[in-house]
Amino acid sequence: KAVMLYFANMKIAQAFHPLLSSFEVILRNQLHYALAHHFSDGNWIINQKNGFMVASSLTHTNKRTKKQVTNRYLLTEVQKAEKKISDRGARITAGRVIAEQTLGFWNSFYEVHHYILLSGVPCTIFKKLPSGYGRKQVNDVITQVRELRNRINHNEPICFVNKKCDFSY
């Protein structure tokens, strides 16, 4: 029975792969176009390493430890991508850096701190959001898609709860 559930889960997971891949590519490309327009710079992902990715508003004092904490997630991910590209002996281009980024990277543009720095540009890629739907709701949906994608990629059960098929996840 367990083997049957495993293979059923695998088949369902396989069916999701094209959709999840398309979602990620479309989100990535649309965010790139919107941000390239916003910064009037097709190389924004490289050039903004000295711009919004290091803004002072990304630093705050941790209330518990009283230490300063700086969110350099986007900057760090861009630098990692550049190193990876360089280590392959390839020329660093905006297109290559963009292609190296994960869904988590793109998801982070909908976190409050980055969203504010970008003047709400990330939500402009969704032309027909329902009334009452904004940054938080978009972020929540992208996070859910990312979590589903991660469950699928790590061969975790995506629809079987207590040996029954349950798609409520």
For each predicted feature, which ranges?
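Amphipathic alpha-helical interface elements
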Residues: 1-169
